[in-house]
Amino acid sequence: MEDKNKTIKETLQGSADAGKRKKLIIKKKGDDPSTPSPAASPKKETVAESAPSSKPPVMPLPLPGDSGQSPIVRPAPSSHSPAKREESPGKQDAGRPPRDKDTRQGGGSSYPPSRSPFQKEDSNIIVSRPIQRTGPSRPNSGGGYQGNRGPGQGGGGYQGNRGPGQGGGGYQGNRGPGQGGGGYQGNRGPGQGGGGYQGNRGPGQGGGGYQGNRGPRSGGTGTRPMPITSAEVELSQSRGSSVTSKKKGHDKEKSTSDRDFSGAENTKFFKQKFKKTKVVGVSGVSVPKEITLLENVQVGELAKKMNLKPGDVIGKLMKMGMMVTINNIIDAETAALLADEYGCKVKVVSLYEETIIEEEKDNQEDYINRPPVVTIMGHVDHGKTKLLDTIRRSSVIDTESGGITQHIGAYQVRTARGLITFLDTPGHEAFTSMRARGAKVTDIVVLVVAADDGVMPQTLEAISHAKAAEVPILVAINKIDLPAANPEKIMQELANHGLQSEEWGGETMYAKISARENIGIDKLLEMILLQAEVMDLKANPKRRAKGTIIEAKLDPGRGSVATVLIQNGTLRVGDPFVAGVFSGRVRAMYNDLGQLIQEAGPAFPAQVTGIDGVPDAGAPFDAMADEKEARNISQHRIEFERIGNAGAATGTSSKVTLENMNEFIKQGALKELKVIIKADVRGSAEAIKESLEKLSTPEVKLNVIQSGAGAIVDMDVMLASASNALIIGFHVRANPKTIALAEKEGVQIKYYNIIYQVVDEIKLAMEGLLEPEKIEEVIGTAEIREIFKVSKIGNIAGCMVLSGKIQKSANIRVIGDGVTKFEGKLKSLKRVKDDVNDVVAGFECGIQVDGYNDFKVGDTIEAYNVTVIKRKLE
């Protein structure tokens, strides 16, 4: 090392003797501290192998040892660029041991134009050849050979000269672990980071490799070098250079994707070159392969689900002939057509499927046997509620108006062999939706058929619901104590519908019972428990509750009350929950006897209070971990429901076809009866609405503008007044204040307790809106033979009655050349000179028509009567 230093010193002194350059002084740490330092210390910088740069190539830098190359000429120090500098410990690796002051100073030297100050013919300093030159030459400050440093020191080796404010350049040599970048860095512009070839470093060091030139303050790397040849590697190793030595774990060439593209230009290059390929739509973003939608969806929501801009969706819809905005609502069919253009499929789901609540994980060890849920179904008046009454030993049937079940009743009965939960569904034809819900939440269906009546429409409907829900059916043939009972006939009729009894080689269990006389009830219960045992019904009582809303109503004293069938888990007082589109916290719970309870387990029907609305019957019920989450889900469902209702309303009012265009061309042709329905429970209001809407005809439409549970209030009256509607109260009434307001506004309120009374009276009201049917009967015709002109009276037609008779009270029609010229009434009818009431065929008469004188010989006068017949709804 001393030989190297001596050789460099002699070279520099020889240059000074030539007198062509000022003396170049290279000082080490520890020299005169009074000398100011014009250049900052080189910053340590972690670098990585760079990518190809878009900059134009520059000439390669000559290697040390090459002959015939000119040195870099350094100007003399000026006032603003002193020749001497001191490397401050704070800037040049503080903590580095100071060097001994020696003779490492050289005077200015004059190199031949083809020589570089880095090169000497007998120099042992060898570096690999960089492929491209570094930045342009610039005025340099004092540099020099700094030598090697120990671990923790700054860059060592020959750094070369730097301009004011520049980072370290030149050859830095090797460093120990923890040191900054080493290797040949080359020259850099002012304010730049480390550049040039840095070589390899030990563990913990920054990245090595050839960094090349960078722009001012650029963090990016420069041009990429060509691979180092094996000859250069051998040459470097033979002369003691560690530039090409490999580090452990870094002997593989980095792939393009692993490189550090931190510079501005290279970052842009990376984004353009390595952008991932996606299935894209108009907006250049990925479109999912499948999305889920409700029956109606907002344009903005559709765009969000498809990862498209709203403008793209609106543009597509405009091409499809639909003028929409981001807030407009379209149906799922239209959305599916649009999505198909992007290769996206649409799956239509229900409101509750769109907002799925994440299932809680179950532990199979926690599952226990649960009671069966049994739904009693059948035709109206076949004895379903009486059967349940007998089982419960209570008088439930007496509380129902007209002896007909108005809504689902849920009860739990304790038998000798265990608990059974019963659901009693209505048998009236209006309660189709209730029976369908009952079949979906049940485990077993007991089909009650009267032995003296037979299979009826609601019996067949109940069979269809049970089969659709894949629920086993047990048949109870009731009223076998009556003289007209014929159980064999019932079994034959049911066998024709797929319910063949076990006695006849089938799989359906039959029980012959009499609910009134308590005959065969025990056998029926035994059959139910046997079927439940075969089904092996289980539930986990240790998880959060999950169930179904059986019924809901608005109670004056307790607010919204919902009957919930817990299907899994346990519901406790204080639990937050989501019930349909509403949320709440369990304030109180009651069993089917009205007693307060603290918790309800699987297959238990409980009445729950604390809901912020009246949910729909059949809606899902889910206990939640916290109330905030429950409210969020509720808000999403309410918004989706609003969109769905708005879309449905838009669809019904705008769909006009060629077939019905003539019916709607005149607004007066369509008559409408508007009603508001208020009932004690939500299910009854829903059933009444469904029944009344079936009464609509092309001429008279029934429009239920609002339906719900609860008492009739002032708001209902004001809505009815504004829309000219009738209010129907089912098991509810209005208070005196509301009644007075209704009288003032001229709103009619009708009260009912039995559903078929509602249907019958509304049907009569709608029939009154129908245009009566007019039947025309031609009673006689007469031909005009002569015309008599009377100045004071007008023209009189002399006619011969050809058929029938002409009556003075009849309507007449004047027909000429097959065209009706006039229709009206007779003003006078004379036989010779006498006024008569009618003239029969074969006689002549004189006819004067009120308001018509343009008679012509040969025209026909036709007399007819019109019979008005009141029409009925079909």
From Swiss-Prot:
Subcellular location: Cytoplasm
Region named G4: 478-481
Skewed-composition ranges (Basic and acidic residues): 83-104, 250-262
Top-rank lineage group of the source organism: Bacteria
Domain tr-type G: 369-538
Molecular function terms from GO: GTP binding; GTPase activity; translation initiation factor activity
Disulfide bonds: none
Region (G3): 424-427
Binding site for GTP: 378-385, 424-428, 478-481
Biased composition (Gly residues): 141-222
Record region (G1): 378-385
Biased segments, Polar residues type: 235-244
Region G5: start-end pairs: 514-516
The keyword Nucleotide-binding is assigned to this record: yes
Listed Pro residues bias regions: 54-63
UniProt entry tagged with the keyword Nucleotide-binding: yes
Function: One of the essential components for the initiation of protein synthesis. Protects formylmethionyl-tRNA from spontaneous hydrolysis and promotes its binding to the 30S ribosomal subunits. Also involved in the hydrolysis of GTP during the formation of the 70S ribosomal complex.
Family according to the record: Belongs to the TRAFAC class translation factor GTPase superfamily. Classic translation factor GTPase family. IF-2 subfamily.
PANTHER family: TR-TYPE G DOMAIN-CONTAINING PROTEIN, TRANSLATION INITIATION FACTOR IF-2-RELATED
Protein name from the UniProt record: Translation initiation factor IF-2
Originating species: Leptospira interrogans serogroup Icterohaemorrhagiae serovar copenhageni (strain Fiocruz L1-130)
Upper lineage: Bacteria, Pseudomonadati, Spirochaetota, Spirochaetia, Leptospirales
Gene: infB
